[in-house]
Regions:
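Active-site diphosphate/adenylate-binding microenvironment
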Residues: 2-66
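N-terminal low-complexity, intrinsically disordered patches enriched in charged
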Residues: 28-30, 85, 133
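Solvent-exposed, flexible loop/coil residues
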Residues: 20, 75, 100, 127-129, ...
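Flexible, glycine/proline-enriched loop segments at strand-loop-helix junctions
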Residues: 15-19, 90-93, 138-144
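Thiamine diphosphate
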Residues: 50-144
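Hydrophobic/aromatic-lined pockets within catalytic cores
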Residues: 34, 108-111, 130
């Protein structure tokens, strides 16, 4: 069996930390975008944290958003490009801390976007500080 990554996924190294799930999740996301036939009609919105590194490992269309503002940005992209598959891709810190109100209100408005939240239980891009999803007793750089 000869397996090959879709052309949407560039070959080579990524900037993700060893053991980080973003690379795997990103690859699965873009493999599915290709499988569904949306490679020419998809936009992925990422924030400034770790997920923004996906922009450098794919040939997909991206929009960068401020930290925690992925969902309102994705909502605007969807309104401008109604026929596109719009994916909001961000981490738990962005979704459940600074962007929590956007998470709630996007759900209430029933926005027609795909939302992916990667829960690594810390603010990873800034060194592993506690996040709203940090487990009790979990060691972080900002834990007591």
């Amino acid at each position: 069996m000869n397996l090959k990554a879709p052309d949407l996924i560039m070959q080579g190294n990524t900037s993700f930390c060893p053991g980080c799930g973003h690379g795997i999740i990103g690859r699965l996301l873009f493999e599915n975008i290709v499988e569904m036939g949306y490679e020419e009609n998809s936009v992925t919105v990422v924030d400034v944290a770790c997920c923004s590194l996906l922009m450098y490992s794919t040939n997909a269309d991206f929009v960068g958003a401020a930290h925690g503002r992925v969902l309102p940005t994705a909502s605007g992209v969807k309104r401008a490009r109604k026929s596109n598959l719009v994916t909001a891709y961000h981490g738990d810190g962005a979704a459940y801390s600074i962007g929590m109100s956007h998470t709630v209100w996007s759900a209430i408005r029933n926005e027609n976007i795909t939302v992916i939240v990667v829960n690594n239980q810390v603010f990873g891009m800034t060194g592993g500080q506690m996040a709203p999803t940090t487990l009790e007793g979990q060691k972080t750089t900002s834990s007591p």
